[in-house]
Every structure is written in C-alpha cells, then in structure tokens.
C-alpha cells in the first residue's frame, strides 16, 4: 500500500510539470479541429505508423503489468508475495518514468526523451531475456517501467506537431483505438502462448514488442522527414 501511495503521488506531481512545459504552447496554438473519417486519417503520412507505435508500447505496459508476476512464479519459481512485489516495482518504475519525463521536458525535446527511454528499455529487455538471477529480473522490471513510462505522453504531445493541429484530434482518436487493441489483444495472446509453451516465453514476447517499437520509430521518423514534418 505504501508503494501504491508513492506511485499515485509521483503521477500527481508529474501533471503540473507537463502543464508548465507544454501547456502554454497548446493554448496559444488552438485551431479549429477537423474530424476526418478513419480511412482518410490513416492515409496521412506517418499516421498509421504512429498508431501502430501506440499499440506496441501500450502492449509492453499491459503485458508487464499483467503477466510479470505469473512469469516470476512459474518460470523463476519465486514466492507469490515476492512476485507481486516485482510487478509493483514495474508500476513504480513507470510512474517514476513519467514523472522524470515531465521534469526533463524543460530541458530535452520529446524525441531526446524517447531515445533515452528506448535505450533504458533495450537494456531492461536484454536483462530479462538473459538473466537467471531473480534480483536482476526484478531490477529489469523496474527499468522496463522507467523506460516505457515516458513514451505515451511524449508521442501524444508530438501528435499536433507532426500531423497538424487541425487534424490532430482525428489522429489521436485512432491512436487511442490502436492502444486499446494492444492492451486487449497482446496480453491475451501472451496468456495463450504461456499455456501452450510455458511462461518462459514472457521475456522473448516482450522483446518482440520492443523491437517492433524501435523499428516503428525509425520508420515514423523517416516518413516525417520525407514530408518535412519531423520535429527535432
């Protein structure tokens, strides 16, 4: 309960930091929004790719939150109470990642924060994949939360910058749709694969979504650069 209270406090403290860093820009840049049909929204250069990114990194969040304890118990033979604590470390890391992202937004660009986050995620996923030590595995879960936490707010913030404020509402709507698909389908598939192959597949399954996220970021930046909308 103490850790849960700490997570809640960190998230509440992060909100004003984001408002201070980006709120004034959003207010000054308000324009009349266009509501586009789905097909037209997804034809905007880079829109489909950013939606797929929301699917993959939101999937990482929910897979870790939903299946890490089961993995620790079944594959690592950890006591259930320690496995639950390991999952709590993941959520603590995610809350801390979003808080630090709000602090860093005053000095770093969203892309710089994303690159740092992906680096942390890469280290954590590799550690999960190769570590046979329970302490290192728990540390890797904390780092996974720390790395994935900043992705959602930073990609969300960049949507009007990359696609135009007039159509950003439509793009954000699709991003939320794809995020919902990721949060529902990815953990369900993990459960099915876990029953068939054993929960030892958990680190490899997470690594697949990390690689998809990394490839998606490269593809998105390339597309945005080609159309002259890439924000540095």
Per-range role (PLM):
Residues 124, 135-143:
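Paired small-residue
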